Amino acid sequence: MKAFGPPHEGPLQGLVASRIETYGGRHRASAQSTAGRLYPRGYPVLDPSRRRLQQYVPFARGSGQARGLSPMRLRDPEPEKRHGGHVGAGLLHSPKLKELTKAHELEVRLHTFSMFGMPRLPPEDRRHWEIGEGGDSGLTIEKSWRELVPGHKEMSQELCHQQEALWELLTTELIYVRKLKIMTDLLAAGLLNLQRVGLLMEVSAETLFGNVPSLIRTHRSFWDEVLGPTLEETRASGQPLDPIGLQSGFLTFGQRFHPYVQYCLRVKQTMAYAREQQETNPLFHAFVQWCEKHKRSGRQMLCDLLIKPHQRITKYPLLLHAVLKRSPEARAQEALNAMIEAVESFLRHINGQVRQGEEQESLAAAAQRIGPYEVLEPPSDEVEKNLRPFSTLDLTSPMLGVASEHTRQLLLEGPVRVKEGREGKLDVYLFLFSDVLLVTKPQRKADKAKVIRPPLMLEKLVCQPLRDPNSFLLIHLTEFQCVSSALLVHCPSPTDRAQWLEKTQQAQAALQKLKAEEYVQQKRELLTLYRDQDRESPSTRPSTPSLEGSQSSAEGRTPEFSTIIPHLVVTEDTDEDAPLVPDDTSDSGYGTLIPGTPTGSRSPLSRLRQRALRRDPRLTFSTLELRDIPLRPHPPDPQAPQRRSAPELPEGILKGGSLPQEDPPTWSEEEDGASERGNVVVETLHRARLRGQLPSSPTHADSAGESPWESSGEEEEEGPLFLKAGHTSLRPMRAEDMLREIREELASQRIEGAEEPRDSRPRKLTRAQLQRMRGPHIIQLDTPLSASEV
């Protein structure tokens, strides 16, 4: 911070500074004579920094009392006359003389502030502390609301009472802001100016006043954006104040008044710091007394000013309740109820933060009482060295499985005697926390207790009372619900035993409740995250079934299919005119069933696949879109199982082979689409197996089902699809039967609560979805899928 020199150390800037310089310059001529009186001939003279005080001596001894100077006076500066001799050289450097020198300098500075006003601070300090001229020009209000409403005499008594309540809200807001300005314009500005000349350097303005400037900015914004416009509207229209106009501002109360969280968290420490400084620092006490007697303070005490923000933030619900009580209109009552709820919700948040801060302080104090962690006796120095990194107990760490806002608390402590095994009884000191029980032994030479047993987690602890009225058994279990250790506890009295058992049971119940709440909250957040992801990109993300649906679906699937974790890869397509459906040459899975097929030739399977893709968009849609495709109603098969992950395939396919070689079947136009899509199912299974996603011998398979779109009639007749010698014709399972079972499976796997499809036409991709599909993305599905979803 820029130093603020005395009047004789160069020209000062500003009107007030020039007055101070002129005022101090009148006594420059007497500085040497004053120094001669204080320091006779041959006596060591103080350096210029220490001679600063002597320039003000004539002022202090002359007309100081006549000008209303404080009665605090400096000791006679001529001690040699009273003692009849010279003062020893050590007296000049004594702490008592330095204090007297600073006290007199403080007196002179404060008197200067009273006469000429507070000197201007640097611009950066004025901006930080909200100190400036003309900043409160808009914070004005009339004496009564009746001056703004000409027709107040014709208003009902109930409406007048409502206006009085609203007017109290406005006037108290301005009064409160002015009191906040006392702390910055008078106390903070005076302290900073004194520190610029080397006084009260040990006092921290940031610790004393906290974030009061942020509170001032918050209330100015609240007035300019919420309260001020309502008042201006009444001034312009002459109509009564409308509480509905305040609704938008009060609904965002938590965001606007967020600086109050920090202030309320530190208000106790701030007030304790102010009391300590006044009790131990006489110079600061004199400065505070001068501020409290200043005309701008309005006789406000420092501690009263520091507690004002806490009182104001808790007064808003009372003011709004007063307006609600006198508002007969239903619309106004609804708005006021919403405003009150928003304010009270923010106050609950502040109370929770304050309570959490107090709990953390209490935990830190309790942790200071816990000493070393010595639960083992190492046999050698080498073992002790290796154990040392793991012999630290941090009680301030968060509790496992519990929300972060909950802090570990010390619930009970006391001396007991414990017995483990056949050893004798040992005097110990127990600490019962929210989630753990510590067995410690007090140390005679230190105030800390040494941990002598591993921490006993409450969720694994069992307390059993014994026949002895003073004893109970502590059983600590492992993860397998087996005994890990057991302690026989002897309490001083039956009352102590009952208290230990009761507090332990209450702590276990509270811990179990907190863990259950955190588990439910995490599940809700996870479900919300999945829903948001599906809503953002429904065409590229797989659907996420509910927890119950996932469990039931997993039970009906085979182990082979439950291990499939497919990867969906969307590659970038640089050709704008390229078709959305890839050809067979870009897929290593298709065309491999016929080894003799050339790479560049078009097999019948290739033509069949393109026709199927054109006819049924379900083969190109994502899993979520497949579930929205309407299905043709078919009578249910009573002999078919209720839940099947895929239809059964012919025996030849189950053994890993392909369909037999045979003459091309003769089918009608109705069976053309179904038979062709049945072959696509087998092709999909074989393609997945070749890629390593499926086992070599799958037992079930899924497909996309029969298309609801009719055939165009333009397809050409195809030849034999699968050619392999050594197989006979298998006719029992027809393609339409397989597709019917696939439809039933897809219908049974619909997500509960999903909306029914409204249109049977295929969906069209938007430009944004197309751009997302063109980028290189790799999406790993975290749910096991069947072959139809691969």
From Swiss-Prot:
It comes from the Eukaryota. GO terms for biological process: regulation of small GTPase mediated signal transduction. GO terms for cellular component: cell junction; centrosome; cleavage furrow; cytosol; microvillus; spindle pole. GO terms for molecular function: GTPase activator activity; guanyl-nucleotide exchange factor activity. CDD domains: PH_PLEKHG5_G6, RhoGEF. The keyword Nucleotide-binding does not apply. Changing N351A: Loss of exchange activity. Residues 73-82, 529-538, 625-635, 748-762 have a biased composition (Basic and acidic residues). Interacts with MYH10. Interacts with ELMO1 and EZR (in an open conformation). Interacts with CSPP1. Guanine nucleotide exchange factor activating the small GTPase RHOA, which, in turn, induces myosin filament formation. Also activates RHOG. Does not activate RAC1, or to a much lower extent than RHOA and RHOG. Part of a functional unit, involving PLEKHG6, MYH10 and RHOA, at the cleavage furrow to advance furrow ingression during cytokinesis. In epithelial cells, required for the formation of microvilli and membrane ruffles on the apical pole. Along with EZR, required for normal macropinocytosis. This is Pleckstrin homology domain-containing family G member 6. The gene is PLEKHG6.
